[in-house]
Amino acid sequence: QNWPHPQIPP
């Protein structure tokens, strides 16, 4: 999966 932010997913 890809998140718009380079942070840990919720």
UniProtKB/Swiss-Prot annotation:
Expressed by the venom gland. It is found in: Secreted. One of its GO terms (molecular function) is toxin activity. Keywords: Pyrrolidone carboxylic acid, Secreted, Toxin. It comes from Bitis rhinoceros (West African gaboon viper). GO terms for cellular component: extracellular region. The modification Pyrrolidone carboxylic acid is found at residue 1. Bradykinin-potentiating peptide. It inhibits the activity of the angiotensin-converting enzyme (ACE) by a preferential interaction with its C-domain. It evokes transient hypotension. It comes from the Eukaryota. Belongs to the bradykinin-potentiating peptide family. The keyword Nuclease does not apply. This is Bradykinin-potentiating peptide-like.
